[in-house]
Regions:
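Catalytic loop of short-chain dehydrogenase/reductase
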Residues: 163-185, 190-199
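Substrate-binding pocket helix/loop in short-chain dehydrogenase/reductase
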Residues: 122-124, 128-133, 227
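C-terminal helical subdomain
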Residues: 5-12, 17, 206, 225-257, ...
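A short, exposed helix-loop element centered on a Lys and neighboring polar residues
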Residues: 147-148, 191
Length: 304
């Protein structure tokens, strides 16, 4: 084995290439199955995919029933999952959920702050303050509390990965109000945590999600077509498209990446409204935009 291959081998460790997260233990928030099943949420997809890649996964959700539904999917596929339920914006609930996860999994290596609410948009003169405050509590306070209670366990594990889920609404004006402000805050916190806890070998990174077809997004066909036209690829993503980059950021493959914002948006933020307008007037036809997302991609099986 030459020097380069030996170095690469030391970086890869003993991980099975088909199980990139073997031995990892992850706490994923907002990972319950959406009411009624069907369209897959981002947290659910991340939890299921992490487990399929060899991680033990704690599925955290405000609903015990929804968390248990995701764990059933994980366990039925031969993975290791445990459900924890509570309001993660409550310090007491958050601390309890993290401790339950640690007891069940034997520790933590990875945290995914995904739980979020939309709402609180519009003019400051008319916005519902109760909605605004609830969005900020769930989207920002819950992430901070999860990090607060999980970081000591990541330290105990010798380091780990914090993956925060943000949105292009953080940097593009979409009229999203509190949601946009909360996601901008998440990106700022990501950089701070990367700075403060790098000495603990804890990495913090952010996935910045574009126009994905999820329960939280636009689901009517006209809206979906507008969103496809708003990307450079002429397509919309699904939850798996966010879950795969999360696997990378949780794995040792990303061991030298911290403090980064990773856009997963089909190029939506790589250009301007004028660039998109020019692209769509250049002869790109509906047939070149890619097919509508078939029902099979909202199933519970990771796409490859």
């Amino acid at each position: 084995m030459d020097r380069v291959e030996a170095d690469n081998q030391s970086r890869r460790g003993d991980a099975d290439p088909g199980h990139r997260l073997s031995g990892k233990r992850a706490f994923v928030t907002g990972a319950g199955t959406a009411p009624g099943g069907g369209l897959l949420g981002i947290g659910e997809a991340i939890a299921v995919l992490f487990a399929s890649q060899g991680a033990g996964v704690a599925v955290a959700d405000v609903s015990a029933e929804r968390a248990a539904a995701t764990v059933s999917l994980i366990n039925d596929a031969g993975g290791e999952g445990v459900a924890v339920a509570g309001d993660l914006s409550s310090e007491a609930d958050n601390a309890r959920c993290v401790e339950e996860a640690v007891r069940a999994l034997g520790g933590l290596d990875t945290v995914v702050n995904n739980v979020a609410l939309s709402g609180g948009g519009g003019s400051p003169t008319t916005v519902d303050l109760d909605v605004w405050e609830r969005v900020m509590a769930v989207n920002v306070r819950a992430a901070m509390l999860t990090a607060r209670h999980a970081i000591p366990h990541l330290r105990h594990s010798g380091g780990g990965s914090i993956i925060n889920i943000s949105s292009i609404a953080a940097t593009r004006a979409l009229g999203a109000g509190a949601y946009a402000a909360s996601k901008a805050a998440i990106q700022a916190l990501t950089r701070d945590w990367a700075l403060i806890h790098g000495q603990d070998r804890i990495r913090a990174n952010c996935i910045v999600v574009g126009h994905a077809y999820t329960p939280m997004g636009v689901t009517d066909e006209a809206g979906r077509e507008r969103r496809r036209l708003a990307s450079l690829l002429g397509t919309e993503g699904v939850a798996w498209d966010i879950a795969w980059p999360a696997v990378f950021l949780a794995s040792d493959e990303s061991r030298w990446i911290s403090g980064a914002d990773l856009p997963v948006d089909a190029g939506a933020t790589a250009t301007t409204a004028l660039g998109i307008h020019t692209l769509n007037r250049s002869g790109r036809t509906d047939g070149e935009l890619g097919p509508s997302i078939p029902p099979s991609t909202s199933s519970t099986s990771p796409v490859t």
